Amino acid sequence: MLILGGSLGAEPLNKLLPEALAQVAPELRPEVFHQAGKNHDEVTAERYRAAGVEAQVQPFIKDMAQAYGWADLVVCRAGALTVSELAAAGLPSMLVPLPHAIDDHQTRNAEYLAREGAAFLMPQRTTGAADLAARLTEVLMQPERLDNMAQAARRLAKPGATHDVVNICLEVAHG
């Protein structure tokens, strides 16, 4: 399981995930690679140790393609680039939108993936460790569900989007 908090980290995720994973039965716990953000890795690693959960914690991931290739499930925020990457990589996800994002755009992004079966929307305001642990347990006991979510994510990918946008801009510019 890959946990992403962005280059600055997402402190709510850094606190929530160790606590939630501690509530998942040890035999179900996935391997954990947690990108905690600059200056948050040591505290986050200590939270995992205190919770009795093994995790590799780093401040930053230099090779996202490799990290995505390794992951079977991603827990992260729901920024536009992130959800695009999840779709392109065909990865199931649990999305915890930034609650104070402008126009609540991260929730809209997460709702899109969730509605199509590629993600679970886990609102930060209402998702506690027990809620997340229950959802994790549910999907970890049903690997076929993760496979279905991955297929749904792949269907949502728009690998030619840059080309399409350039063509639209050229059409508008040249009338």
Predicted feature locations:
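Two-component system phosphotransfer/interaction surface
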Residues: T127-M141, L170
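Short Ser/Thr-rich beta->loop micro-motif in glycosyltransferases that lines
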Residues: P59, R77-L81, P97-A101
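A short, well-ordered alpha-helix in the C-terminal region of glycosyltransferases
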Residues: R145-P159
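C-terminal alpha-helical cap of glycosyltransferases
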Residues: K158-G175
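Donor-nucleotide binding loops and adjacent catalytic segments primarily
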Residues: M1-C76, T107-E111, R115, M122-L132
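Acidic donor-binding loop of glycosyltransferase active sites
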Residues: G69-S84, L91-P92
